Amino acid sequence: MKLLPAAALLAALLPVLAPAAPTLTVTVANPLAAPRAAETITVPWTAVARALPGALLQHLEVRDAAGRVLAYQVTNVAPNARDPQNVGAGYGDLIFQHDFAAGEAAATFTVVRAEAVAPVFPARVFARFVPERYDDFAWENDKIAHRTYGPELAAPDTAHTGKEVATESGLDVWSKKVSYLIVDRWYNKGGSHYHKDEGEGMDMFDVGKSRGCGGTGIWDGRTLATSGNFATWRVLANGPIRAVFELTYPAWEAHGRRVAEVKHFTVDAGHNLDELESTFTDLDGRPDPLTVAIGLTKDSADHGQEGRSEYAAVPDDGSETVWE
């Protein structure tokens, strides 16, 4: 029998005795029986840092129960935050997605540190300020795109150049026929082209003075008081899975009181609907509540197109729909 030196024997045993790498296990419950595609899962980064001390956002691996590596994103909504104890205070959430099959009651995922730098995952959401088009702000995912209107569009044409002037705070819709990102492509080709379908979809939505798709206002029972164009913008996260941004609307007159608004948008990949939170401030400090209305344009045909839309209210949940 050949005897191994003690050092060699110790080296042979080390792989067996080495402690398992730290792992964060995430289990998500699904109470619905219906299939749910592209469900977004968020894990506070503080939980990641607690389970994986010293974890770096670009050195992670997220796997599902089948061992498939998933695309992920780490938000940083407080870019000036300090994290001297390295507990994850500087970051927001770890984000990834899962397609729940019909009847899938739960799903489990593992998050581990990785030696290699994580790949650059394809972006499926995008949001940006568009100064080259009168200060628009545009956003999209792989399903649909939107835009709204900024201060330069509302500015007067003092130079008499024929500049378009409009006060419009509704939300526009760009209908996409492709899953890749198109906002930059469409702005590059110009409005005379993106109002026609050239293969990728089109802007077929006429906002005008309406609320468009989800715009807001203050209702007094008879008339709707609406803001002007947004004044400032701030992007908090920008893909590849989730985009988050805010638009601020300065004070306007709403039935005898001054009101300001901040819109907070959350745009997720794979979703037909965005999440929009509006915060209204009564600048006069009156105690009586504001009645906020949310609008949806019934007849949205644009640029002489034939409008074909079907409006329906759903009393059970208070929602409204317009099918184009």
Stretches found by the model and what they are:
Residues M1-P5:
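Positively charged n-region of N-terminal signal peptides that target proteins for export
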Residues A21-A127, Y134:
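Alpha-mannosidase-like glycoside hydrolase catalytic domains involved in N-glycan trimming
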Residues V112-D203:
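Beta-strand-rich N-terminal accessory domains
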Residues K298-E324:
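Accessory, usually C-terminal, subdomains that scaffold auxiliary metal cofactors
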